[in-house]
Structures are given as C-alpha cells and as structure tokens.
C-alpha cells in the first residue's frame, strides 16, 4: 500500500481448452509480470485454469483433478509474490460441480468463492454443468489440505469481498444511444427502466457482472 492506495491488476492469460498445465504456466508468468509492476491484487478470469469453453469436458474427472494440481502449482510457484491473487477453476464438492474463484497469498490457498448466478441463455449454458453456490458452505480438501469454501478476510486495513456472478436483470437496462452518452442531454437516472430497480440494486449492493471476478 502506498499513500493509502493499492494497485489492482486484471489479467487475461492466453489459454488452451482443457490444457491446465499450459494455462497455469501462462498464469504464473503473468503473475510475475504484474509483480514487477507493483500490483498487490491480481485478478484472473473465471475458469482460467481450464478455459471457459470446455463444454462437456467439465464432467471429466481427469480435468477436474488436473485443475486442482495446477492450482497448487500456481500457489507454490508464486509463494514469494507479495500479492493477493484470484484465479478461476471448476471444483467438485459433495458430488456437485461449482465454478469458483480461488484466493491465493504467499503460497497458501486461502479459500474458494463459488459463482452464484449462472447465466443460462443464448450462448451461455453454465447451468448444464455447474451448481449455484448460493447456499454452499463447507470445507474442501486439496492435496490433503483443508480449505474453506466461501472466504472472508481482512488484510491490515483492507477488506476484500469476492463475487462471481451474472445478473439477469441487467438485460433489462435501457440501451444508451452512443450520441447521447456523456453528452449534455445524458441523465444517469435514465440508465434503468424504472427507479424501483435502480433503488433495489443500490440497496442490495449487488453490482455484479457476467463472467467476471470482482474484488
């Protein structure tokens, strides 16, 4: 932290579908690049260890096990990095598959945050493979170590909340005319179809976006 600020980096690694070892190598490489640039929080895309588009391969035990092996490898090979790191992978828990963000710090796997809102429309069909993490809470064992599913922690004066989600109501947002956006006629109150939904989103503090890990 410098002058009360920390540098947060969002990274998009080059990935290959179902090639967890290659993807982990790219993730590790980018972590060291971001470290050199002073980043203290590093956020990677969901399912970056396996790639998002594995389709029915998500049901293959070999893929799920290799994803965990590479998660441990990422943690071990970045244990000297002074940063909080989030990566995504599929994780089986109690017979169900979850799309989770794993938190890493100094070689430790801190815990997992399962995705809650699963998009299931158009080209998205996550509900075919994954279970919503809305009510899951427990302990996951990887490489004989126990890790908490759902994780909250304070780092000195900084508190982190992690959410992986998509929110269908955002599809109801009004389209904004490019010519008006930011112009003199632009009114941010018109971003929503009605004030009721606007108020609901603020009150519930659920500003979440599809296919994104937030800190």
Located regions from the model:
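Long, acidic low-complexity intrinsically disordered regions
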Residues: 160, 164-202
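Enzyme catalytic cores with a strong preference for nitrogen-chemistry domains
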Residues: 1-165, 169-174, 203-215
